[in-house]
Amino acid sequence: MSIKLQPVKGSKDLLPEEFGKHDYIVSVSRNLSQLYGFQPISTPIIEYTEIFNRTLGKDSDVLSKEMYVFLDKGNRSVSLRPEFTASIMRAVIYNNLQNKKLPLKYFSSGPAFRYDNPQAGRQRQFHQINLECIGDDSPFSDAEIVLLAHDILKTLNLVDKVNLEINSLGCMESRAKYQQALVEYFSKYRTELSQDSQSRLIENPLRILDSKNLHDKKISASAPSIHDYYTIKSRCYFDKVLEYLEFCGIKYTINANLVRGLDYYCHTVFEYTSTQIGAQSTVLGGGRYDGLFEQMGGKLASGKKTLPAIGFAAGIERLALLTNYTPVDVRPIVIIPVDEEHHQHGIMLLQKLRNNNITTVIDLQDSISKRLNRANYIKASKVIFIGAIEVREQSYRIKDLDTSNECVIIHNELLSYLQNNCS
């Protein structure tokens, strides 16, 4: 019986060129987050299922349809993380980080898992960058997290390919009034709604606004607007966020139906979308989640239960589809000892060059012509030959593979020559 060699459906191998693009996106995001005062953090990709049961919302698509859930050998229910925020908040509570100096600002990246229909920009194993600011309830914190997202997209040369949509879900009082209005409105169309939306009508009508069903969308287009149900405090908060964005020159569109797909959001929610990646239009999204800490059982030393927080995540695969970045190949130096007698001389030079941060490989097998062919195949910039003459004269014969020119360089001038003449 033959072994199945293809990756599991919805996963893929990241070969060097695509890996380089992913690595570039993560590096840009990490470096910019550091300028904003964020620190790196990493959590396990596997968590107890309860972490997500308590945070994502029982009627969310993620929890009801997309989670990878299984029993471990101790008969404990565990899940592959479908997103980062709940795991980060668990780490904060477990490690008592909430009682350190606030705010906490964390950058993380890595794989997440959702059992979904694979298509362009959407895999069952996918990769994200994730940023969380925990412990700051100011409107500027909301604006700053959007500004960081904008700076990442700008550095990736994607600002002209995306649009920022923003909304506010208001405070709990605002949401309660709005949800009642939605129940009254959608109840008139109960039989016309999709089965998923019918099941959400009573417990979480906000989620109907997030439905991907085309008929649901048509009904939602005339639904009441949450903007008519804000408390004065919620309205002032959102107005201040928008004021900061305008001051920073960030263009946005208010989308009254934007609610995001998870239940822990409140106040500001936002998405950067693009029309250039097919059905998966959202490339980056996030919002405020002030109630998540309390929902997960967290407590502050002061006795308070609420820990404000805001963050966002971006899909690396989707960013990679949009960016035109091409990883720059580092062209190595190839050392070719002309015979076995000089292998050790070649290995000594190999170590010397690597210790000086020069990418170098050594080729010890086959004829000189075959080794030159391999050097050309890996796009080496130069070949260094070592033989009896070179050892005797304490020199190296160097061939430039772009021009085919050769030169002889004495030992103590080799480093400066390579540093000045290699791309």
From Swiss-Prot:
UniProt keyword Nucleotide-binding present: yes
MF term (GO), any: histidine-tRNA ligase activity
Catalytic activity: tRNA(His) + L-histidine + ATP = L-histidyl-tRNA(His) + AMP + diphosphate + H(+)
EC number, as in UniProt: 6.1.1.21
Enzyme class label: ligase
Origin species: Orientia tsutsugamushi (strain Ikeda)
Name this protein carries in UniProt: Histidine--tRNA ligase
UniProt family annotation: Belongs to the class-II aminoacyl-tRNA synthetase family.
Residues annotated as transmembrane: none
